[in-house]
């Protein structure tokens, strides 16, 4: 129940009332018939009106966001073929509408392209585009046996542009006039030269069995401190909630 309370998004502006005990007699008029209305404002993280500009992915483009999505892949082509030694365009990017509240943004990547037990050297991977994104410590896998390096296979990543601390996410600051975007987590998936068709998950009539790399986005409204303390309490709470979300997501797809 506590986690559900933390996850519930809302900005509540509550007026704290200071009640003064007044004497009777000539001072009674000071409190007679007084009342104060407490105004509650519901937070918003709406879908942007436009898809991101493919050439300037932190800016809105010209294409309408008809599907009301918050997660975009402007360069992905359905049915893209995997060729060993080549790359496949895939560029996940998260956006929020003008006038939304600031938010912390996370992306979880699930890689189910090759069969379970396939060696890491045969597993498709990606590298981060820039420092707008960081891996969440202890929550990612690389294609190295010791989990080192920057060729990522799967895991949880956080938006980190100008973050206040190395290990914490940064706010995606909303703009009152235009949609804003995180920039792309990565731009392509590399298909290892060592991979062959017998390594790939066999396609069946069940789409859940198809070779896929699935990207999920988690957007957590800023200002929710939870039980955390300190100047970066809301960032720490967002990170903790994202880890729970990613773990639930991973377990639900096993």
Specify the residue positions occupied by each region the protein language model found.
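Sec-dependent N-terminal signal peptides of Gram-positive bacterial secreted proteins and lipoproteins
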Residues: 7-26
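N-terminal leader/signal peptides at the extreme start of proteins
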Residues: 1-7
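Surface-exposed, hydrophilic segments of mature proteins
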Residues: 2, 29-254
């Amino acid at each position: 129940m506590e986690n559900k309370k933390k996850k519930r998004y809302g900005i509540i502006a509550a007026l704290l009332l200071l009640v003064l005990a007044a004497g009777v007699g000539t001072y009674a008029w000071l409190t007679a018939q007084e009342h104060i209305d407490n105004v509650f404002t519901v937070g918003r993280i709406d879908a942007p009106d436009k898809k991101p500009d493919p050439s300037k992915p932190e800016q809105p483009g010209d294409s309408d966001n008809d599907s009301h999505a918050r997660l975009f892949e402007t360069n992905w082509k359905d049915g893209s073929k995997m060729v060993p030694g080549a790359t496949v365009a895939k560029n996940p990017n998260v956006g929020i509408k003008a006038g939304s509240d600031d938010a912390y943004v996370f992306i979880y990547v699930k890689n189910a392209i090759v069969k379970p037990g396939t060696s890491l050297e045969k597993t498709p991977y990606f590298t981060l585009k820039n420092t707008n994104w960081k891996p969440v410590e202890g929550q990612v896998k690389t294609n190295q046996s010791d989990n080192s390096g920057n060729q990522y296979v799967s895991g949880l990543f956080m938006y980190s542009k100008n973050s206040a601390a190395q290990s914490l996410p940064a706010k995606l600051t909303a703009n009152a006039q235009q949609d804003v975007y995180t920039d792309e987590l990565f731009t392509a998936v590399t298909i290892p030269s060592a991979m062959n068709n017998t390594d790939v998950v066999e396609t069946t009539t069940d789409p859940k069995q198809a070779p896929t790399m699935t990207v999920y986005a988690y957007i957590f409204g800023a200002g929710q401190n939870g039980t955390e303390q300190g100047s970066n309490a809301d960032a720490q709470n967002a990170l903790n909630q994202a880890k729970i979300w990613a773990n639930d997501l991973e377990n639900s797809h096993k």
